[in-house]
């Protein structure tokens, strides 16, 4: 497509989405749930075909020299597809919040005032790699009564097209409009520029991908953006703590999977437990090939660990999102220094404390300025599915509208409802 055709194409998608959004907003819960259950069924019925489409994307990605963490994000394994199907079913089982009126109160004038939860309208989703985002976005759009326009990365085009066909089939089975969920069918980057500049059609943009993509969208968008830039998450091992539990959680937070934005990239250890904890986690990381970039105090303890991969941390390491088997390690005086470090260098995404001290836990929960804060749990739990939201559209580190994993509620807004019996203002 040339520039003119791209503009015409995206405006057509926008108009179709805007038109469909009215019907999506009115759809009864039973109809939306029917579409979600149909989508779950279709995902399970088409695992082999979907993996065939996905294999072509993987082959192209490797041939193009795409970094292994990015290739990993492209994979549509049976486990990934089953998680998507379960997410659809979980959403279908959840109450429909659209149309709920809350906080209704009678005023001295006689009128009653409350707020009704309504869909945002149309959201645009721009994402890289992970084709499962197509299903997560589509299912949340359906449940929340929105229409959406999805623009996946060129590296996942075959997978995204195959998944979008299943979404269209599920919408049709439920009697919902075919344009309720639309995938941008071109990989031309000009389509992104058009999509983020159509406030007449699109109410919010949600970018999900690398820092470069999100910075570009944030700078150029003419509509509101729900986003997070980095996933520089921390695990802080406090004094006192259960050392065995801390080793297990710190291991999971880093090594369960390296590519997600909720993997821990920084490990902070209280000085009082460092000599006991660091050799144990060092041995675990050494066995898994994780490089530890530490402060001088941490390195002095870790050098005695057989096979450990060590490097001296630089200032840049404290802010780095590695998405790889690398973790920064710093010994701190205690909870106050840990909180200060996290708030200075972290990305306000997810941070955890491992402790047996209730007051330290409460201080951490209160003072760490992140979208998710955890006590004695892995940062890998920062996920809409794990939080019981069903699928998630993304994770927001902003403080307005939505913060943390964005599920159904994050794709809605509140409008004021006033009920009267002929009252007039005096």
From Swiss-Prot:
Keywords: Amino-acid biosynthesis, Cytoplasm, NADP, Oxidoreductase, Proline biosynthesis. GO terms for molecular function: glutamate-5-semialdehyde dehydrogenase activity; NADP binding. PROSITE patterns: PROA. InterPro entries: Ald_DH/histidinol_DH, Ald_DH_C, Ald_DH_N, Aldehyde_DH_dom, G-glutamylP_reductase_CS, Glu-5-SA_DH, GPR_dom. GO terms for cellular component: cytoplasm. It catalyses: L-glutamate 5-semialdehyde + phosphate + NADP(+) = L-glutamyl 5-phosphate + NADPH + H(+). Its main location: cytoplasm. Pfam families: Aldedh. Gene3D superfamilies: Aldehyde Dehydrogenase, Chain A, domain 1, Aldehyde Dehydrogenase, Chain A, domain 2. SUPFAM superfamilies: ALDH-like. GO terms for biological process: L-proline biosynthetic process. Pathway: Amino-acid biosynthesis; L-proline biosynthesis; L-glutamate 5-semialdehyde from L-glutamate: step 2/2. It is found in: Cytoplasm. Its EC number is 1.2.1.41. CDD domains: ALDH_F18-19_ProA-GPR. Transmembrane segments: none annotated. Belongs to the gamma-glutamyl phosphate reductase family. PANTHER family: DELTA-1-PYRROLINE-5-CARBOXYLATE SYNTHASE, GLUTAMATE SEMIALDEHYDE DEHYDROGENASE. Catalyzes the NADPH-dependent reduction of L-glutamate 5-phosphate into L-glutamate 5-semialdehyde and phosphate. The product spontaneously undergoes cyclization to form 1-pyrroline-5-carboxylate. HAMAP family: ProA (MF_00412). This is Gamma-glutamyl phosphate reductase. The lineage of its organism: Bacteria, Pseudomonadati, Pseudomonadota, Betaproteobacteria, Burkholderiales. The gene is proA.
């Amino acid at each position: 497509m040339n520039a003119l055709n791209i503009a015409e194409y995206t405006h057509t998608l926008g108009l179709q989405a805007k038109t469909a959004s009215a019907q999506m907003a009115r759809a009864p819960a039973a109809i939306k749930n029917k579409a979600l259950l149909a989508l779950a069924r279709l995902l399970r019925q088409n695992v082999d075909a979907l993996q065939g489409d996905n294999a072509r994307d993987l082959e192209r990605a490797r041939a193009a020299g795409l970094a292994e963490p990015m290739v990993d994000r492209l994979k549509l394994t049976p486990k990934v597809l089953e998680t998507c199907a379960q997410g659809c079913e979980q959403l279908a089982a959840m109450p429909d919040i659209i149309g709920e009126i809350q906080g209704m109160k009678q005023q001295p004038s006689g009128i009653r005032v409350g707020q009704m939860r309504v869909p945002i309208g149309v959201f645009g989703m721009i994402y890289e790699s992970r084709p499962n985002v197509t299903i997560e976005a589509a299912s949340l759009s359906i449940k929340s009564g929105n229409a959406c326009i999805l623009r996946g990365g060129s590296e996942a085009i075959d997978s995204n097209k195959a998944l979008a066909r299943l979404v269209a089939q599920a919408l049709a089975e439920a009697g919902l409009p075919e344009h309720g969920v639309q995938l941008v069918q071109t990989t031309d980057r000009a389509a992104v520029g058009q999509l983020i500049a159509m406030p007449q059609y699109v109410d919010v943009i949600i970018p999900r991908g690398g820092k470069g993509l999100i910075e570009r969208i944030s700078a150029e968008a003419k509509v509101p953006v729900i986003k997070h830039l980095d996933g520089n998450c921390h695990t802080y091992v406090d004094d006192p703590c259960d050392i065995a539990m801390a080793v297990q959680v710190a291991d999971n937070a880093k090594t369960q999977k390296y590519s997600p934005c909720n993997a821990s990239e920084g490990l902070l250890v209280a000085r009082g437990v460092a000599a006991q904890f660091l050799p144990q986690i060092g041995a675990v990381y050494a066995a898994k090939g994780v490089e530890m970039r530490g402060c001088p105090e941490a390195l002095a303890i870790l050098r005695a660990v057989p096979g450990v991969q060590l490097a001296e941390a630089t200032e840049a390491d404290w802010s780095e999102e590695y998405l790889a088997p690398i973790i920064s390690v710093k010994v701190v005086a205690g909870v106050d220094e840990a909180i200060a470090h996290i708030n200075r260098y972290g990305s306000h995404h997810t941070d955890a404390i491992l402790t047996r001290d209730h007051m330290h836990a409460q201080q951490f929960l209160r003072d760490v300025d992140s979208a998710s804060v955890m006590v004695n749990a892995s940062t890998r739990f920062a996920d809409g599915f794990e939080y019981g939201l069903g699928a998630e559209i993304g994770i927001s580190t902003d403080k307005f509208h939505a913060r943390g994993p964005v599920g159904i509620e994050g794709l809605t807004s509140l409008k004021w409802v006033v009920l009267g019996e002929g009252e007039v203002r005096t």
